Each structure stands twice: as structure tokens, then as C-alpha cells.
């Protein structure tokens, strides 16, 4: 049976900006502007009156100190009443999934009829912190009673104080980065370099096909730049249409240079982008004349010890989501697994197959590629996965679909969608 006993929640529509490698064509665009752009286009595509929206929920992992609540900035679009409440959240790489399931909960219990959910990340513009020493000096200088005293305090600044502190993608509990954890999983689960490269190549080939035939581009909102001379961006720019196993094999490991197997080619790139998803109660969607893409049947979150296998929590979350949905693995017609690393995807699949006894059909998994090729803006990926899966379920008339996302902290999110 579906999660809870409340109202049925429909995924009405979704869209996203192009996902572009950090430091490339979207490097001058603020996260707030990307998020608002995706939301604005979703309202246009659905022709929805802004007065119908009850709440806005947005995921973001690395917010700007200048815009700490990007969700509220989305809700202040001219198309929306200023009275719509909004908030932002962070469940690492599953943030947009969490935004969608939070929206589901509010609708299910009757606190809302229509919720706009999504996520954003601009990894070209992460906050750079000053050193602790420089911060202490600046605080002392601000308390000085005279200019002479202030200059005296500032004279304590040394070159070492000017070295910035960049955000780390490492676990505070273990000190290991995502990539180091992926290396650990590859070794412990017997995932070879060749297997990782083959999965990465598969991701690029399928994403290239999905772009070529229009299935992926249909969900993309073109970005029209405000800076003179910047290009119009209409597609993801991380998809390598001409890559090969031979080219991938030339790359050296990044996280364990001597014995490692995780490379830039079989990992997801740092990415800029935003996604947006429109959710409604089934009754509201019908009343407004919408035909939903899918319905949220169930979801689950789970966690494992980060010191074990950081990105292996899907083996806990997915069975729980299927149990809550009242269905079995073999009933799934399409599956979207977030590709943080090929080593992680293959470890997850091995856990499903050997640990849970499930038969793996790769033909229904990531049928248009995944994050390795398309990109991974941390806070936005979940919205892309919901949109991609729901659209493809409609095209293929698939009854049940699954989203599986690993996340920092040894966490995972799993969502089951249904068509009828």
C-alpha cells in the first residue's frame, strides 16, 4: 500500500536548466537566478496561475551567505503572490528528493494542494572562507577605538592568514572524501577499473542518445544570458559523444594514485544547474485539468555508518521504499540510480543482487544515462531524476518506477512512482 493514508499526490510536470560543468558557461550565474529560471519556466509550461501554489520548497547543499534561503527567493517571482511561504533544505545529494517528498507530505495530509519543489547548485560559486586567524584579526580590528589602534591590529596580518579555506567534500566523521570512499567501495566490493569505465561509457552513450532524440532536451529550459557575449545554453555540456574505453583508460586515478581505479572519467563532474517539479493532490490536478505524469506511491530514507561504505545506503532505503509501496523489485519497469561514481552504482547493484537476491536488468536502469554524463548539481539532481523518470514512464506506459540516490553522511533516498 502507498506511504501513509492521506491523499494521493501527483507529479504534474518538471523541468530543469541545462546541467553545465562548473567553471564553464554558467559560471557567472547565481544559484538564485538558476532556481528562479527553472521555476518560472515550469509555471509557463503548465500555464498555472501562481495563486494556486501553497508552498515552495527548495534544496541546496552549498548556499551563498548572501542568499541563505533560496526557496524564498523563488517564491518571490513576479508570477507568484508574495504571501506564499517557502523554505530551503539540505539532505546533501538527495536534497531535491527531500524537497519533493516534503511537498508530498504536506499535500498528503491536506496542508497544501499545490507545491512547487526543486533544487539548485552553483558549484562555480561556492563560498570561500577566510582563515580563522584572519577572521580573528578582523573582529579585533572592528572593535578598535581609534584608527591608530585599528591599523595596529591589522598590522598583525601575515601572508599565511590570506590563504582561503575552501569547502571540503569530506566527511567530518571520517575525514574521507566522496572519492576516497568510492575507492574504498570499489576495493571492498571487487569493482574493477574496466567495469567502472564501461558503466561511465554507457552513461555517456545513453545520455547522448537521449539528447539526440529529444527526450532529455524536452525537460531542459534554455538559459538566455544577461551578460553580453555569453552564449545561449540549450543542452548539458558534460556529455561526451566521442569518448571511448580507450580514452578513459588513459586517465590516472584521482584519489589513490598508486592503486586506485576511480578517475575523472568514471565520476560525476562538479556541475551548475537547477530543477523544478510541480506537485498537486490528485483531486486538485483533475480540477485544474492536468494529466499527471505519475504519482508518488511511496518513499524512504535510510542511513549507514559513514565509516563502512559511505555510498551504500541505497541497499537500505530501496527495500524500505518498496515495502511501503507494497511492490517487489521485479515489478519495477524503470529505475533511475544517481551516479555519483561508477564504483558506487556498481556497488549498489551488487548489494541489490547479492545481498538482497534481486535480479538486475540493466536495460531498465538509467535508460538515458546518468549523473556521470549529465552532471550533478548537488541540490538539483533529485528534481532531474523525478522529471526524467516520470516522463519516461509515460512514454513507455510503465506502471512502477524507482529513484535511488546516495548522499553524503552515509544516507540515501528512494522514491517509488506509479502511473495509474
Regions found by a protein language model. Give the residues of each.
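Conserved catalytic cysteine-centered active-site region
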Residues: 29, 60-115, 125, 156-161, ...
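Active-site-proximal alpha-helical scaffold in enzymes
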Residues: 90-121, 129, 186-215, 276-283, ...
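Conserved beta-ketoacyl condensing-enzyme motif
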Residues: 27-115, 119-145, 220-235, 307, ...
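Active-site pocket-lining segment
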Residues: 180-183, 226-227, 297, 304-373
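N-terminal extracellular/periplasmic Venus flytrap/periplasmic-binding protein-like
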Residues: 16-17, 27-37, 45, 158, ...
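Flexible glycine-/small-residue-enriched beta->alpha junction loops
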Residues: 114-184
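Condensing-enzyme catalytic core mediating Claisen C-C bond formation in acyl metabolism
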Residues: 1-31, 155-162, 167-168, 245-312, ...
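Active-site pocket-shaping loop/turn-to-helix segments
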Residues: 17-40, 44, 62-64, 87-101, ...
